Amino acid sequence: MEIDLNADLGEGCGSDEALLDLVSSANIACGWHAGGPNAMRECVRWAVEKGVSIGAHPSFNDPENFGRKEMDLPAGEIYAGVLYQLGALSAIAQAEGGRIAHVKPHGALYNQAARDPKIADAIVSAVHDFDPSVAVFALANSGLVTAARNAGLVAIEEVFADRGYRADGSLVPRKEPGAMLDDEDEVLARTLTMVREQRVQALSGEWVPLNAQTICLHGDGPHALAFARRIRNALEAAGIGVHAANAVRV
């Protein structure tokens, strides 16, 4: 049994290089919610050195809100914005001897794409026109998974061990109670359940089936790096290999 571990990098948390020793896929901010050319180049260089799969982490152009404010934009504008960010990271990756293997939208763009077909299709179209061999990381069971597969792209279904889930499989919004899980032992147990049993318990108590292909490790917070290391160690102790998503076999 295998799983991919991913983390969002280039966002100024300060632990990017160390996180790259723990994950198999890196989602690199493309400058619209955080990061910039220097951070992008640094993260790409480290990822290439450590053999970590490189992914783009595009967002709405909203640095003031860290890309977490929902926006109602025309599909063409979303398409162009995603394509623009992919182009920027791709140029840096090529110069450093790497390439973009996947795309994971950030923040509000990610959440809206999970439920809004217009936004999902705009993202998928941009990825397809950029390079149809690039995979899309999307919330498990979401509309973005469907849109990507309908367009002939590889969709990698993502789960979050430290986020609360609703009974419909969506994430509890960050501003609501139960959105974030703080008990490390609970999160570790939840991680193993997601991978082994392919399900997660919602806040309501119901069990939600999901296809866990990649797990997001959060790198922000004073104890995030140590906890990410605990998760990696727990998976390996349970006999679960950690490999980039394009090599995952569940």
From Swiss-Prot:
Listed EC numbers: 3.5.2.9
One Gene Ontology biological process: carbohydrate metabolic process
Pfam families the UniProt entry points to: LamB_YcsF
Keyword Hydrolase: yes
Keyword Hydrolase: yes
Top EC group: hydrolase
Cysteine disulfide links: none
GO molecular function, one term: 5-oxoprolinase (ATP-hydrolyzing) activity
Subunit structure of this chain's protein: Forms a complex composed of PxpA, PxpB and PxpC.
The protein's name in its UniProt record: 5-oxoprolinase subunit A
Higher taxonomy: Bacteria, Pseudomonadati, Pseudomonadota, Betaproteobacteria, Burkholderiales
